[in-house]
Amino acid sequence: MTKNKVLLALLAVVFLALPQSLCAQFNWKYTVEKGKIVTEVPQRAPGQTTALQLTTPKMPVVRVGFVGLGMRGPSAVERWMHIPGIEVVALCDYEAKRAEACQKILRDNSMPAAAIYSGEEGYKELCKRKDIDLVYIATDWDHHFLVAKCAMENGKHAAIEVPSAINLREIWTLIDLSEKTRLHCVMLENCCYDFFELNSLNMAQKGVFGDVIYAQGAYKHELSSFWKYYWKKNAQDKLGWRLEYNKDYRGDLYATHGLGPIAQVLNIHRGDRMRTLVAMDTKSFNGKKLVEKYTG
């Protein structure tokens, strides 16, 4: 077979595989128009309205259940201790000992002990409780959608650490549930609420910069020191999931830290929208060295 024929054969395989690959990644219908992937926007049911401006009755006390108390969850419990008018009702993690460890945070802040839930489906029992208003989700990424969906289906508001979902089907399902139940479903993009970002947003909204027509942002986070935790593939403590995403996917896996504050300044979904998105990355320069370090 000539080189040209071999090249054409390889290209044919790539293009035949591309739709299946993209469909699996998006888990959603799409078309390709002029070289761009265009995803479908689902039709709302009659009478169903957006939840972007949703307000709910004020609560004298917000009763919270936490799901996911590994690396990030305990610090979330700590932060909630500084918010007046809250009650921590339940703590849940795959491992009971991690949920139990957070009881000390409550004791140190003169709060009563919370109920403990554990195991792969402990969150389901937590979400069924009648005395919880909001479920705070800090699990591994694969469980963000599952817990948020369960929370809203059981009448609870959902607050989800980044990312809120991992494909378009999950994203649209959460939007649909929030609109139908009239419950808040919030992605906790913390970079939108730091002092610098909020100050910049306030200045933009007050016209200090005039008409904002261009914005640029970035997020840099050195994660090499976390590899000793992330490397625990199939570990009992479930920390090995993180590196799977870096291994299996390209582009920007964590775009919202840099993009979120910009979207607020540009009034995205509040009068404007994004029409085209492009994601790319460089090759991994240190990944191979770290893999060799942890595998020998």
Regions found by a protein language model. Name each.
Residues M1-L10:
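Bacterial N-terminal signal peptides that target proteins for export
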Residues A9-S21:
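Bacterial N-terminal signal peptides
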Residues F26-N109:
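N-terminal Rossmann-like dinucleotide-binding module
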Residues G68, T181-H184, C191-G296:
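Predominantly a Rossmann-like dinucleotide-binding segment in NAD(P)-dependent oxidoreductases
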Residues I83, R129, D194:
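Acidic-histidine catalytic/liganding microenvironments
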Residues A90, L134, Y214:
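Short, Asp-centered acidic motifs that coordinate Mg2+ and/or phosphate
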Residues A114-I137:
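A structured beta-alpha segment of the ubiquitous adenosine-cofactor-binding alpha/beta core
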Residues L134, D140-W141, F145-Y193, G207:
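Beta-strand-loop-alpha-helix segment that lines the small-molecule cofactor/substrate pocket
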